């Protein structure tokens, strides 16, 4: 049975982010780069978006953590991502995979399955993405999920056990597992699905949390909790137009306040 995340790991994550300010190398999609960078800054991390194949490998060894998000995958970007992951591993730096639309599109599905052999520290995806990554479903409708997070939990657990990693399957309730333990994270607001980039930005915060000391499962679950809390606060402003600035303010005040 999943254990509900309690407030203590979220409070501890805030402290760790302030104390360590991890540098996160975000090889993320073109749609969300600015928002992702601003979210990382709001939580006390430092973002960098280095995507040229000639530089990505070098920088991956410098950064504290690496995020691979395949949302706008290209052939050149795949080369850069592969090199970055390999150099991050050689340097002992954790990397996180966000398998955007895996299962719905064949090229990215094959690429993400290839990357799984390179031992991600964490994986963050919606239910359809995690099911497809685990080989249990054909996938969802692009970036949208057609399954519930609870339905994908067995796939997440199997994937986590097979890869010795932490898997976060996110939705109305998030489930975070290392294959044995499962933490559930409730909260958030439907407005989080009506603006672009909240899931991708969460993956960046997950990447930051994976670089921090302590229990990685709790750190990743706390990252989910931190984002859901900010979403609840930001939704009080009204609609999607006011949501993004309110969300950034809420994150900043949660961590720095």
UniProtKB/Swiss-Prot annotation:
InterPro entries: Hyethyz_kinase (IPR000417), Ribokinase-like (IPR029056)
Cofactor(s) required, per the database record: Mg(2+)
Pathway(s) it belongs to: Cofactor biosynthesis; thiamine diphosphate biosynthesis; 4-methyl-5-(2-phosphoethyl)-thiazole from 5-(2-hydroxyethyl)-4-methylthiazole: step 1/1
Gene Ontology molecular-function annotations: ATP binding; hydroxyethylthiazole kinase activity; magnesium ion binding
Pfam families: HK
Keyword terms: ATP-binding, Kinase, Magnesium, Metal-binding, Nucleotide-binding, Thiamine biosynthesis, Transferase
Positions with a binding annotation for substrate: 49, 197
Catalytic activity as recorded in UniProt: 5-(2-hydroxyethyl)-4-methylthiazole + ATP = 4-methyl-5-(2-phosphooxyethyl)-thiazole + ADP + H(+)
GO biological processes: thiamine biosynthetic process; thiamine diphosphate biosynthetic process
Keyword Kinase: yes
EC number: 2.7.1.50
Keyword Acetylation carried by entry: no
Superkingdom as given in the UniProt entry: Bacteria
Binding site for ATP: 124, 170
Stretches assigned to coiled coil: none
Family in the record: Belongs to the Thz kinase family.
Role according to the record: Catalyzes the phosphorylation of the hydroxyl group of 4-methyl-5-beta-hydroxyethylthiazole (THZ).
Name listed for the protein in its UniProt record: Hydroxyethylthiazole kinase
Lineage: Bacteria, Pseudomonadati, Pseudomonadota, Gammaproteobacteria, Enterobacterales
